[in-house]
Amino acid sequence: MSVQDTKAVEFSMGHIRSSSVSLVAEATSNTNSEDKLSKVQLYEDLCRYEDTLSKLVESVDRFKPNLDIAKDLIRTDEALFENVKLLAEYDNIYRNLQKIDKDSEELDSKTRKILEILNECHDELKALPMLEQVEFEKNTILQQRSKINSTELLDYATKLSKFTKIPPTFDKGAVGPNNFIWPAEDALRRGMLAMASLHSKELTRIPGEEVEETEVPTVPPSQSEEQKGQMAKKEGTPKTDSFIFDGTAKEVGDEADNTKDKEKEENNDDALDLDLDLFDPDDF
């Protein structure tokens, strides 16, 4: 082998080592990714283009270029150029795949929630009594009701009616006039109807109507002083001898007014005595 041949072999081996670190070589290192990418036509054309190019470079390094390899490289390049146009379609497929994955995750979460709710409903349903038990309890209640005779109910009702005699063990002091539902006579006299009858004019007065007031004749102060002087001269008592009323006289006057008011109220109570005797002891 000549010196040129040895140099060409060394150069070709160096080129092979440099090409081993290419993108395709790194992708082939992973078996899983290789299985997925091998199904793509673009990946196959790219691998074929790289292999053909490496063969052509090797033949050129040996100073023996092969035309068949060059033609094959041209055909591979044309096919690769045609398949590059499919990258947009692959991009759309990838986006649709991401959307489908997102929808799948949402459906999984919804399904998980539905299963949890169904599990809770199952536990609640399991805690409820069975239909047979409910029907059994219903039948027992109906049987107990059917055992009660109507004559017994009527006999018990006659014991409670007011036409029967009071049992000997009955406490007469338990029920009195204070326990009846209707009001007593005193409460009726002090009720709203009795108070309304006293103030009928105020209650029946039309709103906005002025209250009629008795007119009091007004006397000028000069005339009132002259009249007082004349009365003093007739009585023969000087003005200096007039009595000075203090608080004691006022208290006596207030007590007299209070006694008069009480007498009026008693007279009004006597006038309102309508003989409303609603309690009849003979009925019991």
Curated annotation (Swiss-Prot):
Any Pfam family: Med4
Primary location: nucleus
GO CC terms in record: core mediator complex; mediator complex; nucleus
MF-aspect GO terms: RNA polymerase II core promoter sequence-specific DNA binding; transcription coregulator activity
Biased composition, class Basic and acidic residues, residue ranges: 225-238, 248-265
Acidic residues biased stretches: 266-284
Compartments reported by the entry: Nucleus
Top-rank taxon: Eukaryota
N-acetylserine modifications at: S2
Region (Disordered): 205-284
Modified residues (Phosphoserine): S242
Residues modified as Phosphothreonine: T237
GO BP: cellular response to heat; positive regulation of transcription elongation by RNA polymerase II; positive regulation of transcription initiation by RNA polymerase II; regulation of transcription by RNA polymerase II; RNA polymerase II preinitiation complex assembly; transcription by RNA polymerase II
Keywords assigned by UniProt, alphabetized: Acetylation, Activator, Nucleus, Phosphoprotein, Transcription, Transcription regulation
Purpose: Component of the Mediator complex, a coactivator involved in the regulated transcription of nearly all RNA polymerase II-dependent genes. Mediator functions as a bridge to convey information from gene-specific regulatory proteins to the basal RNA polymerase II transcription machinery. The Mediator complex, having a compact conformation in its free form, is recruited to promoters by direct interactions with regulatory proteins and serves for the assembly of a functional preinitiation complex with RNA polymerase II and the general transcription factors.
Family label: Belongs to the Mediator complex subunit 4 family.
Note: Present with 1617 molecules/cell in log phase SD medium.
Protein name: Mediator of RNA polymerase II transcription subunit 4
